[in-house]
């Protein structure tokens, strides 16, 4: 599995992962830092896990997941995360690394019923901080990782 910056051409696959319109995901790529985890088709195992890529051969790639984030004040806010458990675990390293380099905390809101994302957050070291805001009536749980 490799990780690279998302590009506009990824919007269709990101829309498939989220159920959101392609235009919304295209705007996400423009407005936030978005990283995608992918595997090259037909070459599984040819690349070391966690590698970096320039992403110049997107037709030969299968996107497994993505994470979007932005930084405000002293906190990196993870705004969206979708994908396989392995991909989301790997992708959470991206905002964590950025935050560590900048001496910032990381915050993640997860829908309270999304056990897969809650488990991934806890597995990679986030601490549950209590309830977060509601989005569209859905309660969330706030997770935080301090430097």
Model feature map: region roles:
Residues 73, 78-87:
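A short, internal acetyl-CoA/4′-phosphopantetheine-binding micro-motif in the GNAT/acyltransferase core
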Residues 112-131:
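Conserved active-site alpha-helix within GNAT-family acetyltransferase domains
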């Amino acid at each position: 599995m490799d990780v690279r910056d998302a590009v506009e051409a990824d919007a269709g696959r990101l829309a498939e992962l989220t159920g959101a319109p392609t235009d919304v995901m295209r705007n996400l790529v423009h407005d936030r830092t978005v990283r995608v985890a992918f595997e090259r088709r037909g070459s599984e195992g040819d690349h070391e896990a966690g590698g970096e890529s320039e992403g110049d051969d997107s037709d030969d790639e299968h996107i497994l997941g993505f994470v979007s984030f932005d930084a405000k004040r002293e906190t990196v806010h993870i705004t969206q995360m979708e994908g396989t458990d392995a991909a989301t675990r790997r992708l959470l390293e991206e905002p964590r690394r950025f935050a560590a380099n900048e001496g910032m905390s990381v915050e993640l809101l997860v829908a309270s019923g999304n056990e897969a994302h809650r488990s991934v957050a806890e597995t990679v070291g986030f601490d549950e901080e209590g309830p977060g805001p509601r989005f569209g009536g859905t309660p969330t749980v706030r997770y935080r990782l301090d430097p």
